[in-house]
Amino acid sequence: RIFKRLGLKTISVKADTGNMGGSGSEEFMIESPVGDDTLMLCECGYAANVEKAACRPDVPTDDSGNPQVKTDLPVEEVATPNVFSIEDMEKFFGTTSKRFIKALIYRVINCGLDLSKANGGKNFKQVKDGNFTYYPLSYVCVLIRGDLEVNEAKLAGLLKCSDLCLAEGDEIIQMANAPHGFVGPMTLNCPIIQDLSVVDMHDAFAGSGKEGFHIKHVEPSRDYTPFMVGDVRTAMVGDACPDCGKPFYSKKGNELGHIFKLGDKYTKAMNVTYLDQSGKPVVPLMGCYGIGVDRTLASIIETYHDDKGIMFPMSTAPYQVAVVPINYKDKMKEASDQLYEELTTLGVEVLLDDRNERPGVKFNDADLIGFP
C-alpha cells in the first residue's frame, strides 16, 4: 500500500534474508531495464529473486534426449590429459554436459550445521559461543549437474553460514586429493552437498580425484553417500515453476523494500524478555521492515518524467501547486498572494515564486523541481 500510494507498481518476490537469517522474506521490486536484480516469474503468480527462486527438478537426459538409464557397469577410470572444464569433457567424451557431475570445493565460514558425522567433518574445529555451536572454517564439496550453476545464496542458507566462496589451490588438493578440474565424489575429505539435479542421474561422468583422470559409469545412489541433498541450483529462464510447472520468464528489477521475520533468534541469544498480563516472562519476536528511501525516490523519477525533467505524482511532489507570477509587482503581486493564501487555507502545498527573475527562468525551474 505504501508503494501504491507513492505511485509505484511493485512486484513482491520471495527473497534471501542474508546473514541475519530468519524466514518469510519478501522483497518489493520495481521493474527496470537497468535493475541490478533478476526476477524469476511465472504466469501463475510465482515470483522470486533469482537468489531464492526454486524450480522443479527436471529429468536428466542422455545424448538422444531420453531419460538416463541406470547402469550395472563398475566405475571406470579414463586418462584425460589436458581436460579441465565441462567444455573440455564434452569434446573429449563426445557427450552433453547433462551427463557430467560437476564437483566444486567451497570454503565455508561459520557453518552452523553439525558436521561431526559427515565425511571429513571431524577434521574441522567446532566452537561453542553461548547457545551457538559452529565451525569457524570448514569445507564442503557441492555436486551439481554439469549444465547448471551453483546458487551460493541457497548454499549459504543450507549450511547456515555467514559466508562462503570457492576454494583455491592447495585447499582443493587437501579436500579432494586432486586439483581443480579433476575433483570427484569418491575421494573427498569433506562433506558432500548434493544438488537435487544429481539424484536421478545415471551412468554419469565425473572427476576421479586424481590429476589427469576422470571416471565414467558413476551411479550417485551406489558409488558415494552425500551428507545433504538439497536445492542449490540457480534457476534459469525456461525452468519449471515449483507451483504449477510452467516455464519461468525473467525481468530485471530494483529492490525498494524488504521484510522478513527473525522470530526469537536474537532475543533468545540476548536473554530479552518482557512480562505478559499474567506476570510471566515471554521472549519477544523480532522482524525487519525496510524501505530504501534513495532507491524509491530514484524509481519515482525514473517512472515520472518527461524531456524537461521530473513530473512527481501528487503524493510525493515537494509542492502540489506552483504560483508563478510573470512580474511579482502591483496587482499581479496582490493576485498571486491572494491565490497563495486561498490554496494554503484549503490545505494545498503551494510554492510562490516571488523571485525577481525572467518568466522563462521561473518556468524552467518549475519543470526541474517536478510539480505535478
PLM features: residue spans?
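NTP/phosphate- and nucleic-acid-binding module
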Residues: 1-372
